[in-house]
């Protein structure tokens, strides 16, 4: 197993969710047990010595690898959700996507000051959702957060928008 095999397992879907977008569909990679194991093992190896105590996953595809990564790292897992999906008091942030606008919320008691945080999402495009997630995490007085992606679309330069990221790592870059 290698990164070329992982890349080959990711389906390209043209004009989704709107014309002009080439959607990187990771569901085809996730359904293959060997590919899933390789991806999570590679991400684990990168973060295993960072002292991560909380992994924060962005709804919804960030939940898939984020929760597995939290388990492997012996860390807790925190959900960043769309509005109205979390039952307790939340912080909320609105942001722009490459194809519209959206919002994210996090429980106000999700992160402690002493936590070492890893933010995980499936894909970095323009950086809108990741930057919104970092803005939410800054409400917990975290000066810097590790940030992880399965895929980065480098031509969209989303990395430049990620304020407050300590270290940004993408396993695959297109």
Predicted segments, located by residue:
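PRPP-associated nucleotide enzymes
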Residues: 1-174
């Amino acid at each position: 197993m290698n990164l070329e095999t992982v890349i080959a397992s990711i389906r390209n879907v043209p004009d989704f969710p709107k014309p002009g977008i080439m959607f990187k569909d990771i569901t085809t990679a996730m359904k293959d047990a060997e590919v899933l194991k390789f991806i999570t093992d590679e991400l684990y190896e990168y973060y295993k010595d960072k002292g991560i105590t909380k992994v924060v996953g962005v709804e919804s595809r960030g939940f898939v690898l984020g929760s597995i990564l939290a388990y492997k790292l012996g860390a807790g897992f925190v959900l960043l959700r769309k509005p109205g999906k979390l039952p307790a008091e939340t912080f909320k942030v609105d942001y722009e996507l490459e194809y519209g606008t959206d919002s994210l919320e996090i429980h106000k008691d999700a992160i402690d000051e002493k936590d070492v945080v890893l933010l995980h999402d499936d894909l970095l495009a323009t950086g809108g959702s990741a930057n919104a997630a970092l803005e939410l995490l800054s409400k917990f007085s975290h000066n810097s957060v590790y940030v992880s992606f399965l895929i980065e679309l480098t031509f969209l330069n989303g990395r430049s928008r990620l304020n407050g990221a300590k270290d940004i790592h993408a396993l695959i870059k297109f």
